[in-house]
């Protein structure tokens, strides 16, 4: 936790959450993001199938007023909430980032591993647990040959500022990971749907 956003103190109960290894996951959690919505906290994370073949997304929840300690988080369901299914996603869904707009949750996620190329997809939910992918194509694709993001547009983070404007931050590179760049795109909302400006 931090009071100034610069200096942080580690939670004494770290790790505050680890999924229970079993039929659907290997017991690890990475790329975590927490959002408060629907009267509770959601912790979205990437994990892998028990055979470590596919990267998938899971979710845990904690009640409003939580101190974020380990004992407050519980797995919200006994399955992955998002899995790779389209050709461009290959065997990986990771780096979920969620924003709520007018009661609907929008998840921006990375599909495929770094430099495959990784691209950004979009899914929606009304309860934070059951998700539907918006399209079988990326929301934000990698760039053309020679572009700064030719090898990937990945690991998204959706950010809403105090004025309500949303921005999609993401990483990219053109040389298969030897150098990395960060960028952002402004998101505009039309008929309740995000679009790149």
What do these predicted ranges mean?
Residues 1-197:
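Carbohydrate-active catalytic/glycan-binding domains of CAZyme proteins
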